[in-house]
């Protein structure tokens, strides 16, 4: 009888050990809410401000949050329309006029206008702008050829360059050329 109790206890102990170890093998159930997207990144972004960001890790996020006037076609270095539906380049190559898509809104609900585009470039290029910020390693030099940005009307923005500058459109497609809401910048910096 003593042997039976010992065998019984051993069998029960092994069974409990097996059952308890199986609990650790159950896959973890994600606790992410259904309206949240989780994206793996190398590190936390330093900023979400296109004018200040210089890290490739941050660029990946910005390119999924903001749009620029133009962007690169998927898998190519060819520029295509984004916030701008079209553009004209003057014969001398010094003036770029962009027609903006109508009805486009920023995440905060404000409209994307020529004034918003002008605000973004003015704050990047004008040291005296009240919201001037280019971060510790400014990439604003991509736009150093810009002499003036004009909001011709709500849907048209014009860039005047100091000389013809072939990479201008390509530079607009770079993350530094992304357009953020002026209201959000004024509110959050």
Protein language model features and the residues they cover:
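N-terminal secretory signal peptides that target proteins for export/translocation
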Residues: 1-7
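Bacterial N-terminal signal peptides
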Residues: 10-24
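Sec/Tat signal peptide C-region and signal peptidase I cleavage site
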Residues: 25-30
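Extracytoplasmic
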Residues: 32-36, 43, 64, 82-84, ...
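N-terminal lobe/hinge region of extracytoplasmic solute-binding protein
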Residues: 40-91, 122, 129
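Solvent-exposed coil/turn segments that connect beta secondary-structure elements
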Residues: 42-45, 53, 74-75, 92-94, ...
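Aromatic- and charge-enriched surface segment that lines or borders ligand/interaction sites
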Residues: 85-131, 158
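Surface-exposed binding/hinge segments that line
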Residues: 118, 136-185
């Amino acid at each position: 009888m003593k042997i039976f109790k010992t065998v019984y206890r051993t069998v029960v102990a092994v069974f409990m050990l097996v059952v308890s170890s199986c609990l650790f093998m159950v896959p973890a159930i994600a606790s992410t809410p259904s309206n949240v997207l989780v994206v793996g990144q190398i590190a936390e972004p330093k900023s979400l401000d296109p004018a200040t960001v210089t890290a490739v890790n941050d660029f990946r996020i910005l390119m999924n949050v903001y749009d620029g006037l133009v962007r690169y076609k998927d898998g190519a270095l060819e520029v295509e329309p984004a916030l701008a539906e079209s553009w004209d380049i003057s014969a001398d190559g010094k003036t770029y006029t962009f027609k903006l898509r109508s009805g486009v809104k920023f995440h905060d609900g404000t409209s994307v206008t020529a004034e918003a585009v002008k605000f973004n470039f003015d704050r990047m290029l004008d040291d005296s702008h009240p919201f001037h910020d280019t971060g510790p390693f400014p990439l604003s030099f991509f736009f150093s050829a810009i002499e003036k940005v004009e909001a011709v009307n709500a849907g048209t923005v014009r860039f005047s360059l100091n000389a013809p500058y072939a990479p201008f459109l390509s530079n607009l497609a770079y993350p530094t050329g992304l357009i953020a809401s002026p209201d959000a910048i004024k509110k959050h910096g």
